[in-house]
Amino acid sequence: MLIVGAGFGGICMGIKAKGAGLNLVILERAGDIGGTWRENVYPGCACDTRSHHYSFSFFMKSDWSRRFAGHAEILEYLHNAVDAFGLRNDIHLKQTVRALHFDEDSSFWSVKTESGATYRARFVVSAVGQLNQPAWPDLPGLETFSGKRMHSATWDTSYDLKGKTVAVIGNGASAVQLIPEVAKKAKHLTVFQRSPNWVVERNDRAFREI
């Protein structure tokens, strides 16, 4: 079996496939596993369900540090899952899939990557997700805007928002997490919403050791 993508879905599928005794290859275009939790590093990035619910049912974690775990802790959990189920050597990083061809005679897939490698597999699973293509609004003047411009999916962690005048466009799942954090640092924050709603800080807290 060949799996494209080493985020939550790809890792879960890999664990199950390996447990079923299948030979396995997981191709990941990035330099690390994690998918969404590797890519997203914006302020306040965390799971929006309780941490103890945000794990594989077959690999539960009891020692989450917070009610809503941050991206770094979730990424660490995925690394632990990969090691616990022996997937590390099955994952090939920096392998971007460019072409797939199904051979009717052999009933095998031929999978070619950007690096020139070719893989053959009886089964191919796409686990690329739908959160890896940042979408910018089509606004006049956006391309010529001279100030700092960032997308929540490709956040520049080196840029300091302290004392800045900031505009956030949108109020989706990422926005409601980052808005309270940006508001703590920005000199002035304006949020542009198509459908107005209130944004409040999540009821988060650190867990105490027992």
Predicted regions and their residues:
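Feature captures the FAD/FMN-dependent oxidoreductase FAD-binding
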Residues: 66-132
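Rossmann-like dinucleotide-binding core of oxidoreductases
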Residues: 2-8, 12-26, 30-32, 118-119, ...
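Tryptophan-centric aromatic hotspots in well-structured domains and transmembrane helices
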Residues: 8, 37-39, 64, 96-111, ...
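Glycine-rich active-site loop/strand segments that organize a redox cofactor
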Residues: 38-77, 196-210
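A short alpha-helix-loop-beta-strand transition element characteristic
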Residues: 39, 88-90, 188-191
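Short polybasic/polar patches that bind polyanions
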Residues: 18, 38, 83
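Conserved beta-strand scaffold positions in the cores of enzyme catalytic domains, especially
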Residues: 53, 91-92, 147-150
